[in-house]
A protein has these predicted regions:
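Electropositive, glycine- and tryptophan-enriched low-complexity nucleic-acid-binding patches
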Residues: 249-295
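Short, conserved catalytic/metal-binding motifs centered on acidic residues
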Residues: 26, 40, 64-70, 102-112, ...
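Active-site- or DNA-interface-adjacent structural scaffold in DNA-acting proteins
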Residues: 57-239
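Acidic, metal-coordinating catalytic cores used for nucleic-acid/nucleotide bond scission
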Residues: 14-18, 48, 304-312, 332-333
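Basic, amphipathic alpha-helical segments enriched in Lys/Arg and hydrophobic/aromatic residues
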Residues: 206-207, 211, 221, 225, ...
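Alpha-helical support elements that line or immediately flank enzyme active sites
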Residues: 24-34
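Flexible, glycine/threonine-enriched loop-and-boundary segments that flank and lead into catalytic domains
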Residues: 236-251
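Basic, short loop/linker segments at the boundary and entry of helix-turn-helix/winged-helix-like folds
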Residues: 1-25, 338
Length: 382
């Protein structure tokens, strides 16, 4: 796995405390224990079993004190991660221990990001706060007066709005209009400072990225304020890649995070498709079957999937290649309908218990209920 990730020991400079294989083991330990980075380092210093698992020895007199080393390793692996090559490597290792390689079970789930529930007010206020803070910093560095605006008045109104238990729609709309107008003014004031003193100011790459996101937020909020629908909606300034995913569940109608279409082979799950934008998993059944056949080199004979996969295109594909499914029958019954009914029942029962149960196990015991990574690549690695 370390070779597949492109990790190697340094030939020059100070020797790494963690070897390439130890870095992979540390990430596995992180997911298994559910510890924070600081807690993981503390347990690693004092637990000989964790050290043996990672293949390192930490003397009590020289413990690891910098817990950010876990984050550095996570970013290093995330920048080199290739999910397909990793899964092919793991599948080749697990294949001798697996049975029923001809059965493909598939379903989609959402692994939520650890973020506050997004609202228009929160998004606008985060944009205003960041922009005003940087305008003040620019003026302080240049030694010029701050431009006049209504930031303090809007801040007081927003604080009063947040403290209210019952919020009238008319008051909320008035405050939203004021925040949109103020955001437009702050952007124009910032652009004015840049046009006059841009050569004296230094901007980072993160600054430009955050500024472009705020401009998109302003455009989207103006569109929604005028009653128009917005596609590809931004729900977080920090995690600008996250999009709302409508799930239609009783407890959570909308979720925010990575939507993943999984296949399961004898209890082992593999990622077929991952996206932070909503997608229709029903059209991906053919890709799931092809992926399993590529990983296991065994022809798929049975498919267990949810009703969303039971469209006409998938039914024709499975009929063409002689694949039995768990889909509810359409049309007249065949001669061997009792046997097919038993097979459909077994496939549906297996999918509902093992596949959907694995989602709960991952989220409860492997730190996937709320992913706390801070950027897109590390969130995929998590």
């Amino acid at each position: 796995m370390a070779k597949a990730a492109g990790l190697s020991d340094r030939r020059l400079g100070r020797r790494n405390r963690f070897s390439p294989s130890a870095k992979i083991a540390l990430m596995v330990l992180k997911a298994y224990t559910g510890f924070s980075d600081r807690q993981l380092v503390e347990h690693l210093n004092g637990n000989i079993h964790y050290q043996i698992f990672c293949g390192i020895m930490i003397p009590p007199s020289l413990p690891i004190t910098n817990f950010k080393i876990v984050s550095a390793i996570r970013n290093e692996i995330a920048s080199r991660l290739d999910i397909d090559s990793f899964q092919e490597l793991l599948a080749s290792h697990w294949k001798p221990y697996l049975d029923n390689l001809h059965v493909c079970m598939t379903d989609a789930t959402c692994y939520e990001s650890h973020m506050r529930f997004p609202t228009d007010m929160k998004l606008l206020w985060e944009s205003l706060e960041w922009l005003y803070r940087h305008i003040c910093r620019h003026c302080r560095e240049l030694g010029i007066r701050r431009p006049r605006n209504k930031y303090r008045n809007v801040a007081e109104s927003y604080l009063s709005y947040c403290k209210k238990r019952k919020r009238r729609a008319s008051r909320a709309r008035m405050l939203k209009r004021r925040m949109i107008k103020l955001l437009e003014k702050l952007l124009s004031q910032r652009d004015g400072i840049h046009s006059e003193y841009g050569a004296l100011l230094r901007y980072t790459q993160d600054y430009h990225k955050r500024l472009s996101i705020i401009r998109k937020v302003l455009v989207q909020e103006k569109e929604m304020f005028e009653g128009r629908k917005v596609s590809d909606r931004i729900v977080s300034i920090d995690r600008h890649y996250v999009r709302p995913i409508v799930r239609g569940k009783e407890t959570k109608s909308v979720e925010f995070g990575a939507k993943v279409n999984n296949i399961q082979i004898d209890g082992i799950s593999f990622i077929e498709h991952l996206s932070f934008k909503a997608f229709n998993e029903g059209i991906r059944l053919k890709d799931c079957i092809r992926m399993q056949q590529k990983l296991m080199n065994v022809r798929v004979r049975c498919v267990a999937a949810d009703s969303i996969y039971a469209n006409n295109a998938n039914r024709k594909f499975c009929t063409k290649y002689g694949i039995s499914t768990s889909f509810v029958r359409k049309g007249r019954a065949a001669k061997d309908e009792p046997l097919r009914k038993v097979l459909r029942s077994e496939l549906s029962k297996e999918r509902a218990t093992r596949l959907e149960g694995s989602f709960g196990t991952q989220k409860q015991h492997y730190s996937l209920s709320r992913i706390k990574a801070r950027n897109r690549k590390t969130e995929i690695l998590w």
